[in-house]
Each structure stands twice: as structure tokens, then as C-alpha cells.
Regions:
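NAD(P)+-binding Rossmann beta1-loop-alpha1 motif at the extreme N-terminus of oxidoreductases
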Residues: 1-43, 173
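Hydrophobic Val/Ile/Leu positions in short beta-strands of Rossmann-like dinucleotide-binding domains
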Residues: 5-6, 71, 156
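General beta-strand structural signal in soluble alpha/beta enzymes
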Residues: 57, 130-134, 179-182
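Short beta-strand and adjoining strand-loop segment in the mid-core
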Residues: 107-115, 120, 145-162
Length: 221
């Protein structure tokens, strides 16, 4: 499975790229500059030299050629980036992972985008793409450390059944992670906003906690 990450040179994009490559996926780290994307890929390959990560850099446009595309650009630029690539993203699963947040004093607060959530704004920017939301609650530092096991549920939301299924399958390939169907994109507003709460807890507890849902019945039961 090939993964393309738009804005893959930032902390979240780099972290996800390394983690997905560590489980055998081929990952294209996209950037506005293909050279910068390759610099980041080289940095990660060198950092984890013993793991033979299949990482390469590219422009964002080339990253769109992957089977699944992840939008990891900063939240305020994500819709614009996706809109510029909308034709290339037609029919593809596009995972929005950014959170609209800003710092107020020592706290993080959620920004409510005009469309209600960043996921919805990304879907509007590429109306023929199959947009899902995922990976919002995984701390980048923990995700980036391949020697640190993960223990997290990942809430997945989408208006497209196929996108939900594909995204959950992707999440489930990461050891320690479990993809959970959280419903339609209307859930994204709450999912994204909760990240501010989680970051606040982690700051106060000096931790890198994610989330786990308890009491869930097995599917089909």
C-alpha cells in the first residue's frame, strides 16, 4: 500500500510517515518543494537506518499519486493545499489529520472553522475525493518514536463508507492502534476540538497520552 502525505515535512507528517513506513508501507513525503520532501525522507531514513524504511520525498502533487493521501499540512493552509490538488485527488481516500488549535496563555483552544470542522473544509475543497478524519489524538512525539509502542484508539469519521473502511484498515496495521468508526464527518468538529483538551492534560501531566475507549462490544456481537 502506497501512502502520500501532503505537508509531510512538518512534525505530524514526519511522525506518521516514519510510523507507516515502519510497518512496511511505501510513503511519499510531499512538500511544496520536492527537494525539501527528499531532505526529510533522507533525515528519517538516516535516523532509523537499521529499519530500511521505504520513504522518499516528492512534491505534494506527486504525493497525490499514492493509493491513500494524508493531508498533514498546518490546519490554516490545509483546505487551500487540497483545493489546489483537487483534480488529482478525485476518487481517492484523503485523510485529514490536522486540528484547528491556537494557544491562549498556557492552554490550547479549539478554533471552529467556518464549515464547522477542518475535515468538512477539506471535503469541500476536494468534493470528488473520499475524505475521512483520523489520527487527531496521537501525539506527534510518541508517534515519531519508533522504539515507543503505541496504545491508542483512533477515531475515524467520514461521509463515505469506503473511506471509513480503508482508513480503519490503515490504522489497524499500526501495532497498538485500533481504528474506531466514529460516524460521519459531522463528528469531526467534536473530535478535532477534543484535541485541545488532550493536549492540555498532557502538558499538565507531562505525558504523551492518547485515548482508549473501554466497554466496546466486538463488531458483529
Amino acid at each position: 500500500m502506497d501512502i502520500g502525505i501532503l505537508g509531510g515535512t512538518g512534525p505530524a507528517g514526519k511522525a506518521l510517515a516514519a510510523r507507516l513506513a515502519s510497518v512496511g508501507m511505501s510513503v511519499s513525503i510531499g512538500s511544496r518543494s520536492a527537494e525539501r520532501g527528499e531532505e526529510t525522507a533522507t533525515e528519517l531514513r538516516d535516523k532509523w537506518a537499521g529499519r530500511a524504511l521505504d520513504l522518499h520525498g516528492s512534491s505534494n502533487a506527486v504525493a497525490c499519486e499514492a493509493d491513500i493521501v494524508v493531508a498533514a499540512t498546518p490546519w490554516d493552509g490545509a483546505p487551500h493545499t487540497v483545493a489546489a490538488l483537487a483534480d488529482r485527488l478525485e476518487g481517492k481516500v484523503v485523510i485529514s489529520m490536522a486540528n484547528a488549535l491556537f494557544k491562549v496563555g498556557d492552554d490550547m483552544e479549539a478554533v471552529v472553522p467556518a464549515r464547522g470542522s477542518l475535515c468538512v473544509a477539506v471535503q469541500d475543497a476536494a468534493p470528488r475525493a473520499l475524505v475521512s478524519g483520523a489520527f487527531h489524538h496521537l501525539p506527534a512525539r510518541g508517534l515519531a518514536n519508533l522504539e515507543e509502542p503505541l496504545d491508542a484508539d483512533v477515531l475515524v469519521c467520514s461521509d463515505h463508507v469506503a473511506a471509513t473502511k480503508t482508513t480503519i484498515e490503515l490504522v489497524d496495521r499500526i501495532p497498538g492502534c485500533r481504528g474506531i468508526d466514529a460516524g460521519s464527518l459531522s463528528a469531526a468538529a467534536a473530535i478535532e476540538a477534543f484535541t485541545a483538551v488532550l493536549i492540555g492534560v498532557n502538558i499538565r501531566r507531562r505525558s504523551h497520552a492518547s485515548i482508549r475507549l473501554t466497554g466496546l462490544r466486538a463488531e458483529g456481537v
